[in-house]
């Protein structure tokens, strides 16, 4: 039962960006700039929080170093979103919503190699999905500024994905 619950939480976390986009596609509408800002901000806050958790709960120094990079990058990205949103007359969420807090909860119970493995696999899946969403927004966003932001953020997301994939190939310690 515990494994099933963990798998459900893992899949939910990994598929969040795609689900946000699919919800709008199902309604026949593209993701609005506000929807994209909300999704990006929630993801930034969640990844920064998970990265902070890794400082205490991960066992691998490589995972801790990677997680700190994500904390730094996603914190800076969140601040950039605030500037972008203010310029566009949009709002940025200031705290994690209930869905994102629920996605973080399973990580609170993990330590050591179990945390490392789950964290790395989650980052691979999450960044793969995020790259898809950001790529779409880089051409479909209503605002030229949002398009430019999505385009400019793609290399960082790719760096995060590449880093997580490299970690997944290292033997667990």
Model-derived features with residue positions:
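His/Met- and acidic-residue-enriched segments that coordinate or traffic transition-metal cofactors
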Residues: 2-10, 15-173
């Amino acid at each position: 039962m515990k494994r099933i619950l963990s798998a459900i939480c893992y899949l939910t976390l990994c598929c969040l960006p795609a689900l946000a986009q699919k919800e709008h596609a199902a309604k026949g509408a593209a993701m609005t700039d506000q929807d994209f800002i909300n999704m990006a901000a929630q993801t930034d806050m969640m990844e920064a929080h998970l990265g902070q958790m890794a400082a205490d709960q991960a066992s691998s120094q490589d995972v801790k170093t990677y997680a700190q990079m994500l904390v730094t990058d996603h914190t800076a990205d969140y601040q950039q979103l605030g500037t972008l949103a203010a310029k566009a007359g949009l709002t940025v969420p200031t705290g994690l919503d209930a869905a994102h807090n629920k996605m973080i909860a399973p990580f609170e119970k993990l330590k050591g190699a179990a945390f490392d493995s789950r964290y790395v696999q989650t980052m691979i899946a999450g960044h793969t999905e995020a790259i898809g969403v950001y790529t779409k927004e880089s051409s479909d966003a209503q605002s030229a500024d949002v398009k430019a932001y999505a385009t400019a953020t793609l290399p960082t997301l790719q760096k995060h994905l590449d880093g997580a994939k490299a970690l997944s190939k290292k033997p667990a310690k």
